[in-house]
């Protein structure tokens, strides 16, 4: 199976959007781990006066995590899937939160609202055709000194962690996908995790994009070694 990209991937997420929140709520630690990665941005003053970009916001769980970490910030959520964004917009938000329908490869409206004090990207980079180009765009969107937090699977090259991921997929993700008619999307997600960078490779990718003070931080529980937070700054 070829990897889903661009419009095909957005359409697959559109279809999955009706059950996506239910699926993630059944995943142990999903929301808590996003909140941890949002806190790791280390935004001062509860985010007062700051503008934060939630890149690949999906149904808004990552947006909610940002608000928990920085309740006084202005948060702009962006996603390529109209279906996922419709779910996000249907939730209750303060006036400081807004959403933009745009692929990460074409963010003219997002660019016009910048520059940004921080960018949060959860479960995004392994799904884009050119992660280096996206990281360069993020670097450009940030103010000097702006912070990036990437919350992502990164387990390539570690056999034990790959076994954990395969067990999770076979025990929960695949049965769920078959029941809800989203098998193609979740086959893509399974492969995208296995084929994406190791933690060290992704940290190097961030440095090549111009980021400094790059750190890789683990998540707790079953996701230790499977999911990481990568934090970095634009010099």
What are these regions, as identified by a protein language model?
Residues 1-45, 61-65, 87, 186, ...:
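Conserved class I S-adenosyl-L-methionine
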Residues 132-144:
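A short glycine-rich, Lys/Arg-flanked "PGG" loop and its adjoining helix->strand segment in the class I
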Residues 105-119:
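A short acidic, Gly/Pro-enriched loop at the edge of an enzyme's catalytic core
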Residues 118-131:
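A short SAM/SAH-binding and catalytic strip from SAM-dependent methyltransferases
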Residues 24, 154-207, 218:
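C-terminal alpha-helical "lid/dimerization" subdomain adjacent to the S-adenosyl-L-methionine
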């Amino acid at each position: 199976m070829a990897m889903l990209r661009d419009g095909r991937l957005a359409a697959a997420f559109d279809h999955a959007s009706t059950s996506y929140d239910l699926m993630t709520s059944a995943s142990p630690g999903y929301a808590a781990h996003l909140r941890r990665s949002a806190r790791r941005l280390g935004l001062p003053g509860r985010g007062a006066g700051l503008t934060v970009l939630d890149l690949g916001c999906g149904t808004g769980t990552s947006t909610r995590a940002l608000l928990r970490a920085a309740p006084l910030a202005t948060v702009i959520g962006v996603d390529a899937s109209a279906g996922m964004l419709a779910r996000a917009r249907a939730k209750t938000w303060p006036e400081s939160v807004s959403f933009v329908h745009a692929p990460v490869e074409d963010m003219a409206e997002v660019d016009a609202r910048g520059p940004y004090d921080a960018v949060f990207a959860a479960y995004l980079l392994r799904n884009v055709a050119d992660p280096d180009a996206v990281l360069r765009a993020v670097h450009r969107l940030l103010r000097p000194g702006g912070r990036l937090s990437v919350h992502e699977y990164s387990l390539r090259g570690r056999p034990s962690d790959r076994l954990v991921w395969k067990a999770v997929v076979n025990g929960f993700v695949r049965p769920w996908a078959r029941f809800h008619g989203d098998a193609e999307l979740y086959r893509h997600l399974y492969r995208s995790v296995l084929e994406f960078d190791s933690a060290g490779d992704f940290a190097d990718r961030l440095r090549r994009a111009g980021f400094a003070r790059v750190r890789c931080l683990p998540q707790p529980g079953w996701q230790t070694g499977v999911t990481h937070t990568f934090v970095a700054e634009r010099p």
